[in-house]
Curated annotation (Swiss-Prot):
Catalytic activity: L-tyrosyl-[protein] + ATP = O-phospho-L-tyrosyl-[protein] + ADP + H(+)
Domain Fibronectin type-III: 444-543, 546-638, 642-736
Gene coding for it: Tie1
Active site per UniProt: D975 (proton acceptor)
Residues the record marks as carrying a glycan: N81, N159, N501, N592, N705
Subunit organization: Heterodimer with TEK/TIE2. Interacts with SVEP1 (via C-terminus).
Annotated organism of origin: Mus musculus
Name of the protein this chain belongs to: Tyrosine-protein kinase receptor Tie-1
Subcellular location: Cell membrane
GO cellular component terms listed in the entry, alphabetical order: membrane; plasma membrane
Length: 1134
């Protein structure tokens, strides 16, 4: 009984048969023996070294994975004849022979399987030809002739599965044919033709082999030409070698073996006295099986007809020039002729064009090719290579083409002694030829000197890589390697131009680096050894802190006192550099303050009457930090000399008279005198009085305190202020102090006594009245506070000043103490009657947001109204008023939440902003996690989110555009996160929540409060310093939130762990659904050094280009083991 096995095993079987086409392996079936008990199969390996202990043994077995029969009556057994031959015996009945047999030989990657298909001699249908080898794209025709006719349909199967059915009347000349058009390699396999309802033992079994390329082609892509295999050889589609039929050998199967011999080198002998008669030879694919050379027929026992030769007698001799046909070898040519048909005349071989001089690098193992032509064609063994020392090398590979034979020689490792003349020799029966060529062995270059340091900065080294070298040129490349001193990390390397200096960038400040050079010359193995190493040290780090000018005071026409400040962070610097630029004259004055703790300096020797631009910057070693915002200072013109002979006289307890003389030789007419008054020993600021009548040289100073000592000095003004006079000291009268003048003394005493009495009475009454008024005012304020909030709010502005807010008809007046003048800030006014409150959108501890319909400029629109609760704290009022100030100053932008207007009603402030119908971005992202909300939808559509990759990237791009606008307006957000981004119409994202924003370049937080730690930059965590660059860090976290669909940053880590690990270089890992380019942008935002983070303009540009690329930068497909990023609401509150 025969039945088909599982077709699932076929790929393993047939793929294995394609491995190692050049393996010398033959499977023989002795068809002369018809008795199953005497039948045997033999597998022979002709591989050199076959049977070594390390190689797997030859295997020969019946392969019932394809065609199965009942197990034989007794087990089959193997008989081994040495290590290279094995025989299978033990068959008991004819059905044991039907099916597929396989022989496996070779080792490692060359392990090869050879197949043989045996048909029953008594079958109903018998194949005209068992093995068919065709090319990819050809038409294959399988033909079975009728051996025992049945009037039933014929079923065709492929690898055991139904393939086609033919009506029994479709037989043509007693044959059933299956035509397969445009066959492909998967079409290979075992085919069978069987009468319907007949025993499978009566089937005709075929084997179809489809080469992986078209006719005459081989290799990957089938772009290489086959060598033109002769005498029925088949070109292997993997390596292009010819698989020769039994009885032939050679690169192109051009040589015939002696009668009765087979194998790749004709080394095997057919058994018995009958020679190869009755034997079927099966070879590695793509050859298949055939009779031996000179035999044909189903049992390979029929000799070839006259004029035919070769395996299965498929070849015709067609001999020319007196040649005779031999059924085993083909045409036997007379002397002077050769070729398949004796069509080629013998001639002396000739070596073709060859380079006269070649160059190799020492230690390499080159391949040298030598091509020759002639009749007969040069073959392997007829071409040799002679070295200068007389050593002869044999070719390792021969490529035969229609007009030439090319031999390839593998040369052992070259030494300098191999330099000299080499010779290629060829010898055939037609003669011999040779050709000499010169080989130059070169030594790769090695630097003799270490690279030189030309310049250095904190993060850069400028290096001259090459001075001199040993060995041979020319220099094709210079590879510079560098790494930190005493470090074990891998060397960093760059390839540079040997004629140019090299700048090593992105180094660590104040760090030693070992720098060395490797040179290369052209050709394989041209890399030389390392040259001497040089130690180079980078400069000190640049100061990162930016000072700001607090004040400057002109103390004279050529003297200027300057004060500045720094953020309260650890100072790394050696001092300060003050720069004054005189633009009119194109001159610069620099003042070096070498004391890093200094915060003030007196600049002298300046040019009077000059406009200066002033800035200050921190320096460290020789490097300058960022300059402060510049200030413009005007020095007055040079003034007159000091007034002369100033003296003072007390007139009473509140009056002192000053007298002086005009300055000598003033520079022009005096316009006025200036008197300076200051309490002696006091800490208060001095006061000044102008004497507008320049002809007067005295003045009575009134309103002074009794019994108080004062200091006075005077200076004149022409076009500029002059020098101060000498300082005089005088005290007012009182408590026994009398005037020096005898006449005015009594008068002054009486007047002083009267005035003291009057002042005492008036002071007592005034104090009583003020006390009563204060009590009444306090009662009124308390009562009004209970009824409603007052209309004045105080908050701390970004500049540190206390600010009072007052509302008056659309003007927000910011009165900043101690400045006496208010600073009005206008905002669009909404009337209370034009606001219709609707639903509560959100609520916090001290504030709430209500959706409302407002009427503005005659149009109704949706708005979000923000307001404080009744018991909000002073800090909440401060932040709320500050947010209105920010919104007013920012203006309009499509990617920020814009101000619609504000309204004051009964002491409450109401701010109307744009309404975002989709809420905040964080909730919007989390709601899109469709695998959690609707798993059936997610699996049906294969997506993890209702949002596309492009929409997520659009959120990030919009947010970057909004932050670019904020940074250009010099506003620091300080709380950028997905919860503070709103989703508006058309799913546009808008930056919101400006309660913590600051309109400054640098802000140092001095107050306590809850901090968004997981979104904060390192410098903000450690030093409470906020800049636009710290907003860039927060944007990187926001980008991570978008990609992770609202995951909690650093989920599973505490704030304390973040404080510890972020400075050590820890960063969030790349989300699995995130493209490398997007994650690289996050990493750029999270760089340690703020100045290395990209500006928002660059971020917005990069995200815009990603949108234009239309690439899926965020993968929302449900890939294997997909999980969402974790969410920890408790951690987000910290």
């Amino acid at each position: 009984m025969v039945w088909w096995g599982s077709s699932l095993l076929l790929p393993t079987l047939f793929l294995a048969s394609h491995v190692g086409a050049s393996v010398d392996l033959t499977l023989l079936a002795n068809l002369r023996i018809t008795d199953p008990q005497r039948f045997f199969l033999t597998c022979v390996s002709g591989e050199a070294g076959a049977g070594r202990s390390s190689d797997p043994p030859l295997l020969l077995e019946k392969d019932d994975r394809i065609v199965r029969t009942f197990p034989p009556g007794q087990p089959l057994y193997l008989a081994r004849n040495g290590s290279h031959q094995v025989t299978l015996r033990g068959f008991s009945k004819p059905s044991d022979l039907v099916g597929v047999f396989s022989c496996v030989g070779g080792a490692g990657a060359r392990r090869t399987r050879v197949l043989y298909v045996h048909n029953s001699p008594g079958a109903h249908l018998f194949p005209d030809k068992v093995t068919h080898t065709v090319n990819k794209g050809d038409t294959a025709v399988l033909s079975a002739h009728v051996h025992k006719e049945k009037q039933t349909d014929v079923i065709w199967k492929n690898n055991g599965s139904y393939f086609n059915t033919l009506d029994w009347q479709e037989a043509d000349d007693g044959r059933f044919q299956l035509q397969l058009q445009n066959v492909q390699p998967p079409s290979s396999g075992i085919y069978s033709a069987t009468y319907l309802e007949a025993s499978p033992l009566g089937s005709a079994f075929f084997r179809l082999i489809v080469r992986g390329c078209g006719a005459g082609r081989w290799g990957p892509g089938c772009v290489k030409d086959c060598p033109g295999c002769l005498h029925g050889g088949v070109c292997h589609d993997h390596d292009g070698e010819c698989v020769c039929p039994p009885g032939f050998t050679g690169t192109r199967c051009e040589q015939a073996c002696r009668e009765g011999r087979f194998g790749q080198s004709c080394q095997e002998q057919c058994p018995g006295t009958a020679g190869c008669r009755g034997l079927t030879f099966c070879l590695p694919d793509p050859y298949g099986c055939s009779c031996g050379s000179g035999w044909r027929g189903s049992q390979c026992q029929e000799a070839c007809a006259p004029g035919h030769f070769g395996a299965d007698c498929r070849l015709q001799c067609q001999c020319q020039n007196g040649g005779t046909c031999d059924r085993f070898s083909g045409c036997v040519c007379p002397s002077g002729w050769h070729g398949v048909h004796c069509e080629k005349s013998d001639r002396i071989p000739q070596i073709l064009s060859m380079a006269t001089e070649v160059e190799f690098n020492i230690g390499t193992m080159p391949r040298i090719n030598c091509a020759a032509a002639g009749n007969p064609f040069p073959v392997r063994g007829s071409m040799k290579l002679r070295k200068p020392d007389g050593t002869m090398l044999l070719s390792t590979k021969v490529i035969v083409e229609p007009d030439r034979t090319t031999a390839e020689f593998e040369v052992p490792s070259l030494t300098l002694g191999d330099s000299g003349f080499w010779e290629c020799r060829v010898s055939t029966s037609g003669g011999q030829d040779s050709r000499r060529f010169k080989v130059n062995v070169k030594v790769p270059p090695v630097p003799l000197t270490a690279p030189r340091l030309l310049a250095k900065q904190s993060r850069q080294l400028v290096v001259s890589p090459l001075v001199s070298f040993s060995g041979d040129g020319p220099i094709s490349s210079v590879r510079l390697h560098y790494r930190p001193q005493d470090s074990t990390i891998a060397w960093s390397a760059i390839v540079v131009d040997p004629s140019e200096n090299v700048t090593l960038m992105n180094l660590k400040p104040k760090t030693g680096y070992n720098v060395r050079v490797q040179l290369s010359r052209p050709g394989e193995g041209g890399e030389g050894g390392w040259g001497p190493s040089a130690l180079m040290t980078t400069d000190c780090p640049e100061p990162l802190l930016q000072p700001w000018l607090e004040s400057w005071h002109v103390e004279g026409p050529d003297r200027l006192r300057v004060s500045w400040s720094l953020p309260s962070v650890p100072l790394s610097g050696d001092g300060f550099l003050l720069r004054l630029w005189d633009g009119a004259r194109g001159q610069e004055r620099r003042e070096n303050i070498s004391f890093p703790q200094a915060r003030t300096a007196l600049l002298t020797g300046l040019t009077p009457g000059t406009h200066y631009q002033l800035d200050v910057r921190l320096y460290h070693c020789t490097l300058l930090g960022p300059a402060s915002p510049p200030a413009h200072v005007h020095l007055p013109p040079s003034g007159p000399p000091a007034p002369r002979h100033l003296h003072a006289q007390a007139l009473s307890d509140s009056e002192i008279q000053l007298m002086w003389q005009h300055p000598e030789a003033p520079s022009g007419p005096i316009s006025k005198y200036i008197v300076e008054i200051q309490v002696a020993g006091g800490s208060g600021d001095p006061q000044w009085m102008d004497v507008d009548r320049p002809e007067e040289t005295s003045i009575i100073v009134r309103g002074l305190n009794a019994s108080t000592r004062y200091l006075f000095r005077v200076r004149a003004s022409v076009q500029g202020l002059g020098d101060w006079s000498n300082t005089v000291e005088e005290a007012t009268l009182g408590n026994g102090l009398q005037s020096e003048g005898p006449v005015r003394e009594s008068r002054a005493a009486e007047e002083g006594l009267d005035q003291q009495l009057v002042l005492a009475v008036v002071g007592s009454v005034s104090a009583t009245c003020l006390t009563i008024l204060a009590a009444l005012l306090a009662l009124v304020c308390i009562r009004r506070s209970c009824l409603h909030r007052r209309r004045t709010f105080t908050y701390q502005s970004g500049s540190g000043e206390e600010t009072i807010l007052q509302f008056s008809s659309g003007t927000l007046t910011l009165t900043r103490r101690p400045k006496p003048q208010p600073e009005p800030l206008s905002y669009p006014v909404l009337e209370w009657e034009d606001i219709t409150f609707e639903d509560l959108i959100g609520e916090g501890n001290f504030g709430q947001v209500i959706r409302a319909m407002i009427k503005k400029d005659g149009l109704k629109m949706n708005a979000a109204i923000k307001m404080l609760k009744e018991y909000a704290s002073e800090n909440d009022h401060r932040d709320f008023a500050g947010e209105l100030e920010v919104l007013c100053k920012l203006g309009h932008h499509p990617n920020i939440i814009n101000l619609l207007g504000a309204c004051e009603n009964r002491g409450y402030l109401y701010i109307a902003i744009e309404y975002a119908p989709y809420g905040n971005l964080l909730d919007f992202l989390r709601k899109s996690r469709v695998l959690e909300t609707d798993p059936a939808f997610a699996r049906e559509h294969g997506t993890a989110s209702t949002l596309s990759s492009r929409q997520l990237l659009r959120f990030a791009s919009d947010a970057a555009n909004g932050m670019q606008y904020l940074s250009e307006k010099q506003f620091i957000h300080r709380d950028l996160a997905a919860r503070n981004v709103l989703v508006g119409e058309n799913l546009a994202s808008k930056i919101a929540d400006f309660g913590l924003s600051r309109g400054e370049e640098v802000y140092v937080k001095k107050t306590m409060g809850r901090l968004p730690v997981r979104w904060m930059a390192i410098e903000s965590l450690n030093y409470s310093v906020y800049t636009t660059k710290s907003d860039v860090w927060s944007f990187g976290v926001l980008l991570w939130e978008i990609v992770s669909l609202g995951g909690t940053p650093y989920c599973g880590m505490t704030c304390a762990e973040l404080y510890e690990k972020l400075p050590q270089g820890y960063r969030m890992e790349q989300p699995r659904n995130c493209d490398d380019e997007v994650y690289e942008l996050m990493r750029q935002c999270w760089r340690d050094r703020p100045y290395e983070r990209p500006p928002f303009a660059q971020i917005a540009l990069q995200l815009g280009r990603m949108l234009e690329a239309r690439k899926a930068y965020v993968n929302m497909s449900l890939f294997e083991n997909f999980t969402y990023a974790g969410i920890d609401a408790t951690a987000e509150e910290a």
